[in-house]
Amino acid sequence: TLHRPSNVDEREVLDPIIRFLLDEVSKDLSIIWPIHPRTQKQLKTFGLWEELLAHPQMILLHPIGYHEMLRLNMDAQVMLTDSGGLQEECCVLGTPCLTLRWNTERPITLEENGGASILVGNNISRIREEYQNTLQKDRKPVRPELWDGATAKRCLEAILSY
């Protein structure tokens, strides 16, 4: 998914990302892309929309619900996104995540902190390098230490021991 102005508002930034998806990622994988309305608008403005629609490996979806997105995330080989929420979900589900941002408000999701996400910004060389590295890795859940599903139990134990 892409929706942040830093990725979609300037053709000079968006076009190389689209070229990477169409020319490189599509050789390895089908691309399923729920399109944010403002992203769709920009793709049309820049004359890229019809090319995406016509590409045989590109499946464009209208915005989808939470459960549908979770299902896609669970089945994904890799997630390319600029969404903070998807960074977290990738960690929980074990989906490798390339975050097309230069920073994140969710640093615990980053690979160096035990998460599944790598910040790649919108630099195509960096995106390409990390994408190729990701395809070589064994997929396994990578979760931060306390993201084990036992938070309620720990809270209850803390309350009872007080």
Report each predicted region and the residues it spans.
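Conserved C-terminal portion of the radical SAM core fold
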Residues: 36
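Nucleotide-activated sugar donor-binding and catalytic core shared by glycosyltransferases
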Residues: 1-31, 39-162
